[in-house]
Every structure is written in C-alpha cells, then in structure tokens.
Design a protein with these regions (language model features):
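Conserved Class I S-adenosyl-L-methionine-dependent methyltransferase catalytic core
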Residues: 2, 8-29, 34-40, 49, ...
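Conserved SAM-binding strand-loop segment of SAM-dependent methyltransferases
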Residues: 208-219
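Residues lining the SAM
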Residues: 234
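Conserved class I S-adenosyl-L-methionine
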Residues: 160-170
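A short acidic, Gly/Pro-enriched loop at the edge of an enzyme's catalytic core
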Residues: 220-231
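Conserved SAM-binding motif I beta-strand of class I
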Residues: 186-191
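Conserved SAM-binding loop
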Residues: 199-200
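Conserved SAM-binding loop of SAM-dependent methyltransferases across substrates and taxa
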Residues: 171-182
C-alpha cells in the first residue's frame, strides 16, 4: 500500500512547522521588520529599540534570517525585498494584520482535540485584548480584500447604479474600490457597531468620506436597509 508521499521526516517536519509560524508571528508582533525598515541595524540597536533582551533578540533575528525573511551582513540585519514589501507597516502591501489574526487564533487551534471531545468552540484569552483581536481581524480582512477588490470593481459593471449597500462590509474595502471605479456611486457600509472606527479610517484614507457612510447594525437580527441599486455581500 502506497504511503502517499508521507514518511517519518515529512511528518515530523509538518508537526514542527509551527516553530516557523511562531517565529514569523513574533517578528510581526514585535514590529521587527517595521523597526528595521530600509536600514541595516545591529542586534544591540534592534534590542534597544524593541526594549527587549539582547540574547532573545539575537536568537529571533537569526531565526528570521534562516527563514530568509531578514538578511545579515557582518553584524547587521536588514529586510529582504519580500519582508520590506509585505511585513513593514508603511508598505501598501503590508499583510501583518492578517498574520496577527492568525497568531490570535493559534491558542484555540492547539485545543482542537478539546473542541472535538466537547463539541463546542474553544476560545482562549491570551496576551491580547479584545480590541487587538478586532483590529487584527478587520484590518486583516482589509489586507486580503485589497488583493481582490480592485479586480472585482473592474469586472462588475455598476455604471447605472447610484447607491450601493456593502452588506457586512467590514472595513469597507469593496465599497471603496467600487466608488473609486464609479465616480457617480455612493455607498453605505453596513456592519456591527464595533467595526465603525476601522471602516471610517479606511474610507478616510482613500478620501471618500463624502461618498461612503457607515451604518451600524446586525443583518442577522435586524431588517436590512433598502433603497439601493445594488448590494454587495462579501
């Protein structure tokens, strides 16, 4: 009977892969990549700016280098082109929010066996606040949608529409790109009240506060607003 490609080494590699995930999560959570930016910095400088332990900082930096997320020349560390583009907060391609969301989910995933036995969700409160969890989730949705929303806005013809409802719109990424694509369009982002500050931040970033409004509500419990030419459910 074929082993379908699995062997001792590949299974142990799969089992221990979380070591790399946790290393990436730590680098993003500590904003190591953002701190380095376009510079090339020593362990001492990075540890001082992180307010971290020198030995711990050095170990993390070497691990990130082994993963090819940093590059080391002599005694200094710098970002790779990929980490500069994807893991620095000042980059348009930043995906750190989604990575932090994965980090926040990890504490529950290690209790999967418990969830199977008890038949109910498991949510572990760890070293982050509800606000941090919400920000990583919503801004992670923004990170993800930024890769698909422009193409969606181009592919879907809303030229005859004047009012769009973005139902469960989160940070409003799709509403933003539909409005950017259609100058005569105005939109409403409808989502839970706790989503509002994140949506308004994104809408303002794109200069669309005069065309996109946020309406708080729960479409699972309340009537969905009417009077729109089109509705987007993402």
């Amino acid at each position: 009977m074929e082993n379908e490609g699995w062997h001792e080494g590949s299974l142990l590699g799969l089992s221990g892969y979380y070591w790399q995930s946790c290393t990436l999560h730590a680098g993003v959570k500590l904003a190591v990549f953002t701190l380095i930016g376009d510079d090339s910095l020593s362990v001492e400088t990075i540890a001082e700016r992180l307010k971290g332990d020198r030995r711990g900082t050095e170990t993390l930096l070497h691990a990130l280098t082994a993963m090819k997320l940093l590059q080391k020349e002599r005694d200094r560390f710098a970002n790779t082109p990929a980490s500069r583009s994807l893991l620095c907060k000042d980059s348009d391609g930043y995906i750190g929010h989604m990575i932090l969301h994965h980090h926040h989910l990890a504490a529950s995933w290690v209790r999967l066996d418990e969830a199977v036995r008890e038949g109910k969700p498991v949510r572990e409160r760890a070293s982050y606040s509800e606000g941090e969890w919400r920000e990583s989730f919503l801004m992670g949705m923004f990170n993800t949608a930024m890769r698909t929303a422009p193409a969606m806005a181009e592919a879907i013809d809303l030229s005859g529409c004047h009012r769009l409802l973005d139902l469960g719109g989160g940070p409003g990424t799709y509403a933003v790109h539909f409005c950017l694509r259609n100058p005569d369009l105005k939109a409403t982002v409808y989502d839970l009240p706790t989503t509002r500050p994140f949506a308004e931040k994104i809408i303002g970033r794109f200069g669309l506060s005069d065309r996109i409004e946020f309406v708080p509500g729960d479409y699972m419990k309340e009537d969905i607003p009417g009077g729109y030419d089109a509705t987007w459910l993402s």
